[in-house]
Each structure stands twice: as structure tokens, then as C-alpha cells.
Amino acid sequence: MKKLVLSLSIVALSLGSCSSDNEEITTQPIPTGTITGDITTAKTYPLGNYTIQGTVKIKSGGSLTIEAGSTITASIADGTADALLVENGGKLFLNGTSALPVVFTETSKTPGSWGGIIMFGDAPIVGANGVTTATSEDGNNLAYGGTNTAHNGGSLKYVRVEYAGKKLTDNTSEMNGFSFYSVGSGTVLENLVAYKGADDGFEFYGGTVSAKNLISYGNFDDSFDWQDGWRGDANTNWLAYQVATGNYGMEIEAKSVNNAFGPKVSNITLTRAAGTVTEGGSSAAEYDAIQFKKDGNGEYSNVVISGYTTANSTAVRIQDKATFDNQVTGGKIKLLNVKINDGTSQFAGVGTTFTVAFPTGNYTTSTTSTGATLTAGAWAIVDGVSLIK
């Protein structure tokens, strides 16, 4: 009887195996579609391949979630100003992963083909003449500024924006890879890449938000830029790699307001590849690693600078005497543990009206500085090439 039971069991297993082999395996199609218009409620796009058409505005009370691994493609050929814009009160959730980033790109792979990601909040700003509100320079003419230091515009993690930085036809308005207007400290910005845009990689217009693990690669204007009294104080691991065309590694200004506060950024790598020219050509002297102007200030530590060796370029440029008097002599610019890897001079002013000298301890060097420390992954790879240099 035991032998009979065993034989029947083997037959049953064999039949089950045959049945399994004959089953059809089906795969679900990858979602596609167009993201366009205003978003006024909660909207989620699952992992898929989408197009963006026109300026998509996330209105107050609305939210947009795009799942990890998705690709969103703009097109200069559609004749619209493609951009993703978060208005104050709206929220954007792009929570990619190292292996599955959320990628925004453009069909022709032409720098400046679309407007990138733009976010507005109501965190504090200090604009020209001390004003606390201002109008955006992205062509949308939206007001920004407020008193909400903890403004929360959502979460951006492992996001790559390619070929953005659209310049508008009025010759004054422009967009960047990422533009943050009075964004607050409740917003999460981590592991973001701005790749080959026609303007700045990242620009902060006031606000209190901080950003971790940023890569600005091959952008035509400045790699990192801010104004309007931006005061994010928990920034770390910023990498700029300028190649072919690029201006300043970091352009730092405060609209000529002598603020008592400033941002803090630790672990910075600024690299300019050989042969890189400024956006304006040989006539534009915008080739320094770091420029302070109009009372820009802040504390920057563990900084590694390489390749800024164009004639007359310098690691740190103080652009005007007011900035030197108020911020350098006033002790509100600190550059700590700076390592210069080549013949780039340490710092210089403009003209002959002042000679740059820092108070003791406010400019220090170190041969062991490491700069940005970033973890490799698909989030930082384009066309098979790692952006982490």
C-alpha cells in the first residue's frame, strides 16, 4: 500500500508540473500618457514613460506623485514652454531610488529645450532694498516670499533633470534645471542631478530649504546660484563639473543687503574641465570657481577646487568693495579647509580699490580635504557615463 501511495503522489506531481509548464506568462504593459494642464487634487502616476506638455502647474491644495523609475519627456518640437511648476500650497513627490531614479529629459537632447522643475513657497526672502516679496524671473511672474520658514513643498529624492534651462524671448526671463523660490525647510531635496542645461543647474531665490547630494553637470551658466537672502544651513555634498561651456561654479549674492545670516554648505567639489569656455565667450570674465557679489556671504567647508586656470581666473572672487567690507572684513564669509588642486590662485578682488584679505581663521586650507562624497548608482549615470567625478 505504501508503494501505491508513493506512486500516485509522483503521478500527481508530474501532472501538476506539466500544467504549470503550459501556463502563459503575461507581462503588464508599461503605463504611458501625457502630463499636462493644472493639477488641483491628488494625482499619482505609476512607474511608466510619460510626456510633459506645456507648463504643468500643481496648484495650492493639489499634489503630484510620480513613482520611482519613471521617465518624463519634454519636447521642444511641441511649441510650448514645457515645465513642471509647483505653486505655493502645492506639493510634488518624486521619490526615486539610486537604482530607479525619476528622470526628466527632452527628445532632441538640446540644452535649454524646456524649463525644468520650478517650486514656489512662502518662506522668508530678503530682496533688493530689503523687500520681503518679489516677482519670479521664470516668465510666470508669480509672487514669492513670506514668513513660513517650515514651508513644505514635498519631497524630491533621486531625480535627474536633463537639457533644461530654457531662456525666454524677452531676454531677461530664464529657467534653470531646478528653481526654488522661497522654498522652506520642510521640503526634502536629496540626490538631485541637473544635467546639461542652458542656464544654472540649481538656483535658490531666498527661502530656508537645504539640499543634500547635488550634481550640477555641464550646465551653461552657473552650477549653483542663489540670491534674495537664501539661508539653508544644512547643505552637504555638492558636486559641480563644468565641461565645454560654463560660468561660475558657485555664484553667491544677496541683492546688496547686508544680512546677519547666510547659508552653510559642507563637502563641495568644483571642477572645470580643460577647454571649458564661458557662456558669453572670451569677452565674459565669469570663469572663477566661487564668486561673491552684492553682499553674498555664508560658510563653506571641505572644498576641493580643480581646473579654474583660465588667465585671470581665481578660486574665490570678491566682486565689489561693499561685499569685501561688509562680508569679508565683517566676518560673514568663511571658507574652511579649502584644497586647490592646480595653479588656480586662492582669491582676488576686482580692480584696484581693495585687496582681499580674510580675518584670521576665516579662510583656511587643507591638503586632505575630500570635497563631495557621493554614492554611485543609476541616478548619476547618463548614457552609460558616471557623472561622479
Describe the residue ranges of each PLM region:
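Bacterial Sec-dependent N-terminal signal peptides
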Residues: 1-36
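Catalytic metal-binding/acid-base residues of hydrolase active sites
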Residues: 71
